[in-house]
Curated annotation (Swiss-Prot):
GO cellular component: membrane; viral envelope; virion membrane
Native species: Fowlpox virus (strain NVSL) (FPV)
Name this polypeptide is given: L5 homolog
Record's function text: Envelope protein part of the entry-fusion complex responsible for the virus membrane fusion with host cell membrane during virus entry. Also plays a role in cell-cell fusion (syncytium formation).
Localization: Virion membrane
Length: 129
């Protein structure tokens, strides 16, 4: 086992002898192949964006909950209790434990929400621009 082993590299020259590359329109076929690959990649990554460009999403219709919330207002009483005013009546705002919410500077709180002095919609802070 004391023999020396010499490895000589063997190189195989790659030859592409496909019919579509040897025809006179070989560049056309390569171009078609590249366009198909590009369209597949675009479809994979940007399918939703392309669809939304041509077919935009329909705006959701207003439901009864949103129309009720649009007509809901917060008001302050003289004793500092926070009241909810709806078309069906005026109700006391309740804490999680069921007790009425009383804030010493109730009108200051409402004016800090969106600049209203006596009443404001509790959902108007989400509609600011």
């Amino acid at each position: 086992m004391d023999r020396n082993i010499n490895f000589s590299p063997v190189f195989i020259e790659p030859r592409f002898k496909h019919e579509f590359l040897l025809s006179p329109q070989r560049y056309f076929y390569i171009l078609v192949f590249e366009v198909i690959v590009a369209l597949i990649i675009l479809n994979f990554f940007f399918k939703e964006e392309i669809l939304y460009t041509f077919f935009p999403l329909a705006k959701p219709s207003k439901n009864s909950i949103n129309s009720l919330l649009d007509r809901t207002m917060l008001k302050c009483e003289e004793d500092g209790s926070l009241m909810i005013s709806r078309p069906s009546g005026i109700y006391s705002a309740l804490s999680l434990d069921g007790s009425p919410v009383r804030i010493s500077d109730c009108s200051l709180l409402l004016s800090s929400i969106n600049g209203a002095s006596s009443s404001t919609s509790p959902y108007s802070i989400f509609n600011r621009r």
